[in-house]
Amino acid sequence: MSLLDYFKSKKKPSTAVMAKERLQIIVAHQRGQRDTPDYFPQMKQEIIAVIRKYVQISDDQVSVQLDQNDDNLSVLELNVTLPDR
């Protein structure tokens, strides 16, 4: 193996591969949102409003997800990035 072969083997993924991966992420995200209840967006905004009473945060610092298992079990996951004091 020559030195040139070593550098040629580390090619960046093509733009088509990157676009395909991004599209798969978007489709998976939309499929996850399709099964959410009608009240979910309003509940998310109300939770953010309560947190804002105590801490200054922006919408991108809060992640709310509703996961549903096959066992008829729903899990509400809330992740908040709190600012430093």
UniProtKB/Swiss-Prot annotation:
One GO CC term, this protein: plasma membrane
Cited InterPro entries: MinE, MinE_sf
Pfam entry (one): MinE
GO biological process, one term: division septum site selection
Function: Prevents the cell division inhibition by proteins MinC and MinD at internal division sites while permitting inhibition at polar sites. This ensures cell division at the proper site by restricting the formation of a division septum at the midpoint of the long axis of the cell.
Key word Cell cycle present: yes
Protein name: Cell division topological specificity factor
Alphabetical keyword list: Cell cycle, Cell division
Signal peptide: none
Ranges in coiled-coil conformation: none
Disulfide bonds: none
Similarity field: Belongs to the MinE family.
Organism, scientific name: Shewanella oneidensis (strain ATCC 700550 / JCM 31522 / CIP 106686 / LMG 19005 / NCIMB 14063 / MR-1)
